[in-house]
Amino acid sequence: MIPVRCFTCGKVISPAWEEYKARREKGEDPKKILDDLGITRYCCRRMLLTHKEIIDELNPYQ
């Protein structure tokens, strides 16, 4: 679950997550993906670059 907004500046970033993830899995360069998606602020870039999906690992503990 990607946060809806950047923690630092508040820009909405969640719509870019699915495309970023799909293109990253294909082996594309993260810099190029983020540039293409229009994510220019380094705080927003950090949100996508450092996010790790752990929701599937946490589901058994509900």
Curated annotation (Swiss-Prot):
Pfam families reported for this sequence: RNA_pol_N (PF01194)
Any one GO BP annotation for this protein: DNA-templated transcription
Xref: InterPro entries: RNA_pol_su_RPB10, RNA_pol_suN_Zn-BS, RPABC5/Rpb10
Keyword Nucleotidyltransferase assigned: yes
Name of the top EC class for this enzyme: transferase
Main subcellular location: cytoplasm
Annotated NCBIfam families: PRK04016.1 (NF003089)
Similarity comment text for this entry: Belongs to the archaeal Rpo10/eukaryotic RPB10 RNA polymerase subunit family.
Protein name: DNA-directed RNA polymerase subunit Rpo10
Lineage: Archaea, Methanobacteriati, Methanobacteriota, Stenosarchaea group, Methanomicrobia
